[in-house]
């Protein structure tokens, strides 16, 4: 399953057998917050971009393949997820705190000033960062890491078997 958040949405994700979605914001603003499932993707957004109260969404989900956050969304894994493949796409100033007990393949695609912190285990980690992105995966045990950074991005990674990295502009990989 997939999740797409647009705007300034705070999302707390919990891996659990039962699926659930709870939205919290100011009562008078709640009708402007939309959650809909389109082609297997849960979309979360606001129909009113002028008013900016905090919008918090708690999601319980058993499996996850893609998270896309645009604008200034904040994604937080509340427990460690066990997944096969996970693709994280961040645009704008969105942030993600990823916790994995196991994953075969983890992919990050960040454009803008997004930030990702990831911990746990992912056999293969692929990263693409453009702009002023910050990626911290030092606490993510990965066998294979492939990374390409452009602009003024910064990444901290760990690879136990294979590393292929390219940094362009004033980007830095450590």
Residue map of PLM features:
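Extended, compositionally simple hydrophobic/Ser/Thr-rich segments
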Residues: 2-13, 57-59, 63-174
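Short acidic/polar N-terminal linker immediately downstream of export determinants
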Residues: 1-31, 40-60, 75-77
């Amino acid at each position: 399953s997939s999740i797409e958040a647009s705007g300034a949405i705070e999302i707390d994700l919990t891996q659990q057998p039962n699926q659930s979605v709870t939205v919290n914001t100011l009562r008078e603003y709640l009708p402007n917050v939309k959650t809909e499932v389109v082609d297997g993707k849960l979309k979360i957004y606001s129909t009113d971009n002028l008013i900016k109260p905090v919008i918090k969404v708690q999601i319980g989900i058993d499996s996850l393949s893609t998270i896309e956050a645009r604008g200034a969304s904040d994604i937080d894994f509340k427990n460690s997820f066990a997944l096969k493949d996970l693709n994280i796409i961040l645009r704008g100033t969105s942030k993600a705190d990823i916790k994995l007990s196991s994953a075969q393949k983890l992919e990050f695609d960040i454009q803008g000033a997004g930030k990702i912190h990831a911990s746990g285990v992912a056999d293969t980690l692929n990263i693409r960062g453009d702009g002023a992105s910050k990626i911290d995966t030092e606490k993510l045990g990965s066998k294979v890491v492939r990374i390409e950074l452009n602009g003024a991005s910064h990444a901290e990674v760990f690879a136990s078997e294979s590393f292929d990295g390219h940094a362009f502009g004033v980007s830095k990989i450590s």
